[in-house]
Amino acid sequence: MLFRSIINIIDQRVKNITPYFTSYTLSKSALYTLTKSLSVFLAPKIRVNGISPGPTLKSKNQTQKQFDNQVQRTPLKKQVRLEEINNAIDYLIENKSVTGEVLTLDSGQSLGWANSKSKVFSTD
C-alpha cells in the first residue's frame, strides 16, 4: 500500500503569541489546527504533520542586527539552519507511525524565556 505524507510549514508563533503579527499568527494557527484535523480525517492513507521553525532567515522587515538580537534571545542562542529543517522533514517522511505532530525547531524561542520580565535567579 502506498502511503502519502503532507508536511505543513507553520511557525513557532502559534506557541509564542505576540500582538505584532496578528493576521500572520491567525493564519498559521489555522494551519496548525488544519494539520491536526487532517491527520485524523485522511488517515490511514495520508499522514499529516507540520514543522514550526523559529529564527531561520532574516525577514525583509528586519535589519541584520535585529535578526541577530532575535537569535540571541533564544535559549540556545543559535539560528535554525535550513539543513535542520530538512532533517526534520526527512524524519517525518521516513517515520510511518508519525501523524498529527508539529515539530518545533526554534532554538527554544517558543518557550518565551527571553520575554519574561522577571529575573528568577542569577546565572552568573
Specify the residue positions occupied by each region the protein language model found.
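A short alpha/beta connector and helix-capping loop motif
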Residues: 116-124
